[in-house]
Amino acid sequence: MRVVILGSGVIGVTSAWYLAQAGHQVTVVDRQEGPGLETSAANAGQISPGYAAPWAAPGIPLKALKWLFQRHAPLAMSLDGSLFQLRWLWQMLRNCDSTHYAQNKARMVRLAEYSRDCLAQLRRTTTIDYEGRQLGTLQLFRTPQQYENAARDIAVLREAGVPYRLLPTAQLSTVEPALAVAGVRLSGGLHLPHDETGDCQLFTRHLAQQAAQSGVHFIFSTQVLRLLRSGARIQGVQCGHDTLVADAYVVALGAYSTGLLQDIVAIPVYPLKGYSLTLPIDDPDAAPRSTVLDESYKVAITRFDRRIRVGGMAEVVGFDMSLPLARRRTLERVVRDLYPRGGLLPQASFWSGLRPATPDGTPLVGATPLENLYLNTGHGTLGWTMACGSGQLLADIISGVTPTIRVDDLSVSRYTA
């Protein structure tokens, strides 16, 4: 089968890889000069199935109001009055109760755990290198209340069979030794030993190279203009001055998927803006070993080979890609608090990206009401965590193979029904 994939971020490239491995003729189109140059370029770097959780959670509406008046708030928003933004926010609020939170987190963990297994299999069968580490993730609590609230997430982890350790303050340095000299008081942490880390852009670039060697055709520096519909099918996609024709089409354009699909199928995928710093390591012994997550600021600090990636926060501000100095200061503050001698902050590069977020936190993977149009988007902050699993599931669905895990609650039908 001929398959055209729109988008060459980590989601588009993993989709291409698994579809090619299933025997399909795959073409990938992207407006950038190469793979992984937008949202996949500088994300936080953690592959954290156990921490897969929606922003829509109990208590978030009240917290969001408080955060509006805080200098270093993890969530911010700027209302533009658009119906799409208001509808998305309303749908998110409807998912903030305990029942929806547990349901959404459970399916996110299911997909993320499966994806980590797919990534492990990919490492075994290829020579791919992405500065990966398999040393777990440590969530840090600055307040006793955060430590106590961990019980809610632990219940979901236990049900999903995810190993974990709830650590008192004195044991944090057994996982991350450099925290022994942290510049801030901590109240404990939650350690997930099976989580991983790695450079998402490096992975995307190297997998694209191996996909090309397997026959995948990449078309870069080409705008995806519109899908050509005829009845219940897509007949082609207009890309630049050309029209590409295939048997199946996959939209993996991240936050830009919504605009392309607006006259075809309505999807609630909104650009959730995030930021990161990438800085060279100063003292390896004073740097993190893997990934730590600061619960107060919703910021992750991740160790690569010779670099530290600091990423997080969420802004509902549309497609604004500006780099406010205040956001940089927040990331710098978290680094100074936790790893004051770990990295060279004056040499840090500052980046922003738009995560494609759904109101319930779960991505849109699979078929649409059009018989040959498929989605792989809406992964929010977990695109790197869920990429391999989403790509494999999509390949199974298109190939008519029964997926290994449940997929019916990942499709767009939960919003269009």
Swiss-Prot record:
GO biological process, any: D-alanine catabolic process
Alphabetized InterPro entries for the sequence: DadA, FAD-dep_OxRdtase, FAD/NAD-bd_sf
Catalytic activity from the UniProt record: a D-alpha-amino acid + A + H2O = a 2-oxocarboxylate + AH2 + NH4(+)
Gene3D superfamilies according to UniProt: D-Amino Acid Oxidase, subunit A, domain 2, FAD/NAD(P)-binding domain
Binding residues for FAD: 3-17
Cofactors named for this entry: FAD
Cellular component GO terms, alphabetical: cytoplasm; plasma membrane
Pathway(s) annotated for this protein in UniProt: Amino-acid degradation; D-alanine degradation; NH(3) and pyruvate from D-alanine: step 1/1
GO MF term list: D-amino-acid dehydrogenase activity
E.C. no: 1.4.99.-
Family: Belongs to the DadA oxidoreductase family.
General function of this protein: Oxidative deamination of D-amino acids.
Protein name per its UniProtKB record: D-amino acid dehydrogenase
Chain's gene name: dadA
